[in-house]
């Protein structure tokens, strides 16, 4: 076990003792899960440690990947179920706009076998490119499948664990905090990385990744009523110029800047 994990566990144990020692006036605990791309999967491990320490969770707030893990946790998924779900996904397919082979016609199957990827051309190409390279429909479908029973517009404060997530409205640059709505839509909006995924259009708003404006939304958890904040920040240090030499490294840097 890494020293950092031991340190976290020790800190959580102290919090647990402090909370359980005051059963009649228990402090409210808020979990804050930052954005951070694929590193956001580390949130699952953090939730396991928090549960093992016996700490009650009263609120969950997340940005980007933190909104996905947090949103699913808030409706009852256990850390073990989340871990299993992440491991069994075909992420190459999910992070693309490919149509499942079973739903393709013959022409689409032939095109899929011929080209590794495609870019939009034609009169709508400029608009699509500005929006993002990936429409994210496969991810949206997954979120919809995982949130069965929560497809209607609902009050997130009435979920098994009250939840909120963060996005940005690029129409005016304002931060948008989702406390109600369709859960899958809120999660998709919170992780719409500019230039990578198309924005989510909702009412008069055009929504992108919440990491642009608030990648570590402690203030949102405080406003919900949390007295104690347990934050999980998985942002990475920025890379120097000589390490930004591939599309993947540049994309990772952009995510970390958010």
Region annotations inferred by a language model:
Residues 1-26:
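Bacterial Sec-dependent N-terminal signal peptides
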Residues 20-63, 71-258:
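Patatin-like phospholipase
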